[in-house]
């Protein structure tokens, strides 16, 4: 009887195309993680959208504070608050860039995994075994 990591052999002694234990494990793991990765991706996308909106609101508020400061007859110093808002905006932009880079890496990784999975399936379906595989 064939082990979990070896290919099956027909009665004539020729290898029978079929997934190895390692391939089955990899595919199962991929299917197990796919919903979590997709959920994470959608959450990152939502956070990025909200950060863009937050950045726009900070810009609007800073502009409005500057306008109020210029229009005031009483000397009210709003500059420190404007600086704090601009500093917060800078941090929001920084976090957004980090999220964007992480999301792009996740997208590339997901693409690579899907490509490798398709390649392995094609090899298994055609009966071609990679060098060093137990079915050779």
From Swiss-Prot:
Phosphorylated by CSNK1D/CK1. Phosphorylated by PKD, phosphorylation controls SNAPIN protein stability. GO terms for biological process: anterograde axonal transport; anterograde synaptic vesicle transport; autophagosome maturation; endosome to lysosome transport; intracellular protein transport; late endosome to lysosome transport; lysosomal lumen acidification; lysosome localization. The modification N-acetylalanine is found at residue 2. It comes from the Eukaryota. The modification Phosphoserine is found at residues 10, 50, 126, 133. Pfam families: Snapin_Pallidin (PF14712). Residues 83-136 are annotated as: Interaction with TOR1A. The keyword Cytoplasm applies. One of its GO terms (cellular component) is perinuclear region of cytoplasm. Residues 37-126 form a coiled coil. It is a peripheral membrane protein. Component of the BLOC-1 complex, a complex that is required for normal biogenesis of lysosome-related organelles (LRO), such as platelet dense granules and melanosomes. In concert with the AP-3 complex, the BLOC-1 complex is required to target membrane protein cargos into vesicles assembled at cell bodies for delivery into neurites and nerve terminals. The BLOC-1 complex, in association with SNARE proteins, is also proposed to be involved in neurite extension. Plays a role in intracellular vesicle trafficking and synaptic vesicle recycling. Belongs to the SNAPIN family. Component of the biogenesis of lysosome-related organelles complex 1 (BLOC-1) composed of BLOC1S1, BLOC1S2, BLOC1S3, BLOC1S4, BLOC1S5, BLOC1S6, DTNBP1/BLOC1S7 and SNAPIN/BLOC1S8. Octamer composed of one copy each BLOC1S1, BLOC1S2, BLOC1S3, BLOC1S4, BLOC1S5, BLOC1S6, DTNBP1/BLOC1S7 and SNAPIN/BLOC1S8. The BLOC-1 complex associates with the AP-3 protein complex and membrane protein cargos. Component of the BLOC-one-related complex (BORC) which is composed of BLOC1S1, BLOC1S2, BORCS5, BORCS6, BORCS7, BORCS8, KXD1 and SNAPIN. Associates with the SNARE complex. (Microbial infection) Interacts with human cytomegalovirus/HHV-5 protein UL70. This is SNARE-associated protein Snapin. It comes from Homo sapiens (Human). The gene is SNAPIN.
């Amino acid at each position: 009887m064939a082990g979990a990591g070896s290919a099956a052999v027909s009665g004539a002694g020729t290898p029978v195309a079929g997934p190895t234990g390692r391939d089955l494990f990899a595919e199962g793991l991929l299917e197990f993680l796919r919903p979590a990765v997709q959920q994470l991706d959608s959450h990152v996308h939502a956070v990025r959208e909200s950060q863009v909106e937050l950045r726009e609101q900070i810009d609007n508020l800073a502009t409005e504070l500057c306008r109020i400061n210029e229009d005031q007859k009483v000397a009210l110093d709003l500059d420190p608050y404007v600086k704090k808002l601009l500093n917060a905006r800078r941090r929001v932009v920084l976090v957004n860039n980090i999220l964007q880079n992480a999301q792009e890496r996740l997208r590339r990784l997901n693409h690579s995994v899907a490509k490798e999975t398709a390649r392995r399936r094609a090899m298994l379906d055609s009966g071609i075994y990679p060098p060093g595989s137990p079915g050779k």
